[in-house]
Amino acid sequence: MRKLSPLLIAVMISLILCGYSDAAERRSLLKPTGTTKGAKQGMKTYYMGRFAIDLPAAFQLEIQSQKIRYAEVFDFKWKERDRAKERESLWEQKLAKIKKLQLPKGRKQIIIEEKHLKGIGNWAKAVEYYGDYRIGDYIYWTVFVDYGESGLWLTLYGLNNQKSLKNFTNILTHYQYGFDNLTKDSFCLNHGRIELPYLEQEEIYARFAGPMEMKLRIEMNETQQVEDVGVLDRLVASLAMNFAPGVDVDKIRTGSRTVAVLPGQEIIIRGTVNDVSELFFAWDSPGREDSGEYPEIRIGLECPDGSLDEKTKIWDAALDSFRPASKS
């Protein structure tokens, strides 16, 4: 396997493509899977937030994380036949991890209260605790729900406990397993969705590993201030300032590109350092202020140089398939 140049990747992604969520990269989530529903032969459809994308079956989803209304949520399929035993084991593991957190000053214990929740799924437990030793006033909640076909974890924090309780209860009571009959209010997770319209604060991050050492990343965030600068503008500015001396950049394709009625900018470039070349594909859309239908979106792909036509076809097909999830 050819080793990618760390310098080249750092320069192109961080400086030109504007980077991706470090927190999302560090998360280790249970592996989700795609579905062939709605996809062409040999393709899989992946749902994320309020959008969907089709990718060749050779692509594997490595990480998918999402937030809705300030709550971090992800669902998963049970591994064991004895669901009750599995959920108790997972819950105890979570509690053990929470108990190892550093205690804020002035607090006597990490966990404030553990409780069963009624009216949410088939079974639900919640733990209230101090999750940040630097800010002792923040109250964290982690909730674990058994919905039958799937389990779900939710974590959020805040200063107003009643507001947090109302928020996560509303989110969890609107969860549905599967992707049939999606609506404009569907916010998709790994295996199901939350049927709530956009209100505020939504984030999605996904990373895929594909053939020919391709890495595809997708990031979506609601924005409160639309930026006029796109990926092409950042590339031009970086080259003008010689921001990465020693890196030769060959522009293969650049310009405006509309994806799923979302206006944006696209670049396909080749970067070379010390005779090692990599290909970088990127598209972004600035979104609209405070919108779930038009979030700020960044899609990027990096891989070793070579097979440009084949990789470009994969890239174009992926962007052409990107669409609102309700239209799948």
Residue ranges and their predicted role:
Residues 17-29:
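Bacterial Sec-dependent signal peptides at the C-terminal "C-region" and cleavage site
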Residues 26-44, 58-141:
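Post-signal peptide N-terminal segment of secreted/secretory-pathway proteins
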Residues 153-263:
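Acidic, serine/threonine- and glycine-rich low-complexity intrinsically disordered segments
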Residues 1-4:
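Positively charged n-region of N-terminal signal peptides that target proteins for export
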Residues 61-106, 153-157, 202-238, 266, ...:
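A short acidic-to-branched-hydrophobic micro-motif
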Residues 9-16:
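Bacterial N-terminal signal peptides
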Residues 55-63, 154-192, 296-328:
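Surface-exposed amphipathic alpha-helical segments
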Residues 97-145, 213-291:
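Signature of long, low-cysteine stretches enriched in small and polar/charged residues
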